[in-house]
Amino acid sequence: MKLFHNKMSVLRNILVGTTIVVTASSAFAHVKLESATPTINASIASQPKSIALNFGGEVMLMNVKLLDAQRRDIPLNYQVSHDLKKTFEVAVPKLKNGKYTVVWTTMGTDGHNMSGEYNFTIKSTK
């Protein structure tokens, strides 16, 4: 009987430990950028009207920047909102031909910040 009780205690401890690890892993899973417009690493022929960032889960977009080829900041009219969303759209000013970098920072529901960047290029169709 004691042997059965010891085996059950070990089994219970394994199940509790596994549950804690799985719960912690999903709670701290970070949301990734799934897609964007202009598309990541795209060469586009015309001026985009906006930048759209599509994430795999709901986040707050804490910051978004647009940088030119020399990594100079191009002002965007973006105000931080505490709304949790999957998709954010930011208007873009008139841009010249060239390479641009979108830099973003989000905060997930777990309070962790995630950041990333991607490039796109505007090429003339002349």
PLM features per residue range, with description:
Residues 28-62, 124-126:
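N-terminal non-catalytic regions of secreted/periplasmic and cell-surface proteins
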Residues 16-17, 27:
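Cleavable N-terminal signal peptides
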